[in-house]
């Protein structure tokens, strides 16, 4: 048995179906670091799978029954459905089939754990908590939902007692995770295809918080009405609140922005009057990012970190991939790639962009899933108000069938009907390039938003602009 886990040390190859997924790859990487043999498949190779191969994993491009080889256990995510050839082969052989969250929970069993949940902000907050614990000398194990720039990966295996994980509420699996400290950033109606109703999602978050042990801690953002209501329902667990509001235990005050950097103080109201961390800075704009940082500060203080350590760690924060990531600057125009695909996220990112530049903000969005656009259509029509120009690409279907009234052109029409002065459709990367050449001027910012292929467009855009300009 491995000292860091209860998994048998002699366990044969662990096969991941969909190993290139951001949630699966982090678990695979930590297992390899612990000495286990890992293999897996995905539809195509990627930077993630290339990294895993460089660490010793065996990768199969495409999914077929023969890929299992001598696998002793098969790990699947909620995206893997009945009929997948590798899943069917595993069941035919009688192999254990383990959900991603179940394997993650196994890795967490021998440690104290910090689990970060919320409809938005999980990945950035997870990265911030990891950054602070690194600075505090805790040497945590980390499994995140995005690539942490300081690691060059979404995971690392540390030697310390603590483990920091992003807790995914999309399929309810976060309630399987044995959290010691549970963070809740916000709660919005999302992933209704799993939960069925907002009340069921609320219950899921309630269970997430109340599942912590009696000696644990819940860290909750009471700027969000749903989270404040959750706090009011929890009566038998210790809770520390954070936010901008005057009642928060860990509160941001004196916030200002300068050249895209947030400067603020943190009032530690739960520690008594006069306890303040002064002179905090965070090298990324956005009130939502400051809020995420407050959650990390609350955890760091709970674990005994000093004010100077916290201040220095956040000032050097390197960020996380696809969370307001600058991918280039051409002719004075800054190009940003961001994962935001929910109206709340889009509005927050565009507000951050407005705080970061003196010029105009040009938003380019690829809606993710017809079902999301359909269920939140009015919110999508009003979340782009901070953008001077909005361009909407074709919906990234993610396997869904089109829904009447929930397409690209419908959203453009909806934006115009709701009063946006400059909304238009784009068809392809060439259209995006033409748009930027036509609209962008020095000092402007182009923000590409979405969870699909829009990231590739954003990353290609600087070279396209420079190549055509040469």
From Swiss-Prot:
InterPro entries for this protein: Mur-like_cat_sf, Mur_ligase_C, Mur_ligase_C_dom_sf, Mur_ligase_cen, Mur_ligase_N, MurCDEF_pg_biosynth, UDP-N-AcMur_Ala_ligase_MurC
Keyword Nucleotide-binding: yes
Keywords: ATP-binding, Cell cycle, Cell division, Cell shape, Cell wall biogenesis/degradation, Cytoplasm, Ligase, Nucleotide-binding, Peptidoglycan synthesis
Enzyme Commission number(s) of this protein: 6.3.2.8
Reaction catalyzed: UDP-N-acetyl-alpha-D-muramate + L-alanine + ATP = UDP-N-acetyl-alpha-D-muramoyl-L-alanine + ADP + phosphate + H(+)
GO biological process, one term: cell wall organization
GO CC annotations on file: cytoplasm
Locations listed in the record: Cytoplasm
Any Pfam family hit: Mur_ligase_M
Pathway membership: Cell wall biogenesis; peptidoglycan biosynthesis
Source domain of life: Bacteria
Family stated for the protein in its record: Belongs to the MurCDEF family.
Function as written in the Swiss-Prot or TrEMBL entry: Cell wall formation.
PANTHER family: UDP-N-ACETYLMURAMATE--L-ALANINE LIGASE, UDP-N-ACETYLMURAMATE--L-ALANINE LIGASE-RELATED
Protein name as it appears in the record: UDP-N-acetylmuramate--L-alanine ligase
Organism: Cereibacter sphaeroides (strain ATCC 17029 / ATH 2.4.9)
């Amino acid at each position: 048995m491995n000292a860091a886990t209860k998994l048998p040390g002699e366990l044969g190859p662990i096969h991941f179906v969909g190993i290139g997924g951001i949630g699966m790859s982090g678990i695979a990487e930590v297992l390899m670091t612990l000495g286990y043999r890992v293999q897996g498949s995905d539809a195509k190779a990627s930077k993630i799978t290339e990294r895993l191969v460089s660490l010793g994993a065996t990768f199969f491009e495409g999914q077929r029954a023969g890929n299992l080889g001598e696998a002793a256990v098969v790990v699947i995510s909620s995206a893997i459905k009945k009929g997948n050839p590798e899943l069917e082969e595993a069941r035919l052989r009688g192999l254990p089939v383990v959900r991603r969250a179940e394997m993650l929970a196994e890795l967490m069993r021998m440690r104290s754990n910090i689990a970060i949940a919320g409809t938005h902000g999980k990945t950035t907050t997870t990265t911030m908590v990891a950054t602070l614990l690194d600075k505090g000398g805790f040497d945590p194990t980390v499994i995140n939902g995005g690539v942490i720039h300081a690691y060059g990966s979404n995971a690392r295996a540390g030697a310390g007692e603590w483990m920091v994980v992003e807790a995914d509420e999309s399929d309810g699996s976060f309630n399987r995770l044995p959290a010691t400290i549970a963070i809740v950033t916000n709660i919005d109606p999302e992933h209704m295809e799993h939960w069925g109703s907002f009340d069921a999602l609320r219950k899921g978050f309630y269970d997430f918080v109340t599942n912590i042990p009696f000696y644990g801690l819940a860290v909750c953002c009471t700027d969000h009405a749903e989270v404040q209501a959750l706090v009011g329902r929890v009566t038998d667990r210790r809770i520390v609140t954070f936010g901008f509001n005057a009642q928060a235990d860990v509160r941001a005050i004196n916030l200002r922005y300068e050249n895209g950097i947030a400067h603020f103080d943190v009032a530690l109201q739960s520690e008594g009057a006069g306890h303040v961390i002064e002179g905090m800075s965070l090298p990324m704009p956005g009130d939502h990012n400051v809020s995420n940082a407050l959650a990390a500060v609350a955890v760091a203080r709970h674990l005994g970190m000093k004010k100077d350590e916290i201040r220095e760690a956040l000032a050097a924060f390197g960020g996380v991939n696809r969370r307001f990531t600058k991918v280039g600057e051409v002719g004075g125009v800054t190009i940003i790639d961001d994962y935001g695909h929910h109206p709340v996220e889009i509005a927050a990112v565009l507000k951050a962009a407005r705080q970061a530049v003196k010029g105009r903000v040009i938003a380019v969005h690829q809606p993710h899933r017809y079902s999301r656009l359909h269920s939140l259509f009015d919110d999508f029509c009003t979340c782009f108000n901070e953008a001077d120009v909005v361009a909407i690409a074709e919906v990234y279907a993610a396997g869904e069938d089109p829904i009447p009234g929930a397409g690209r052109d419908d959203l453009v029409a909806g934006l115009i009907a709701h009063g946006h002065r400059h909304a238009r459709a784009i068809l392809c990367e060439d259209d995006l390039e033409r748009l930027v050449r036509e609209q962008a001027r020095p000092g402007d910012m182009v923000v590409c938003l979405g969870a699909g292929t829009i990231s590739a467009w954003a990353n290609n855009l600087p070279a396209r602009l420079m190549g055509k300009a040469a």
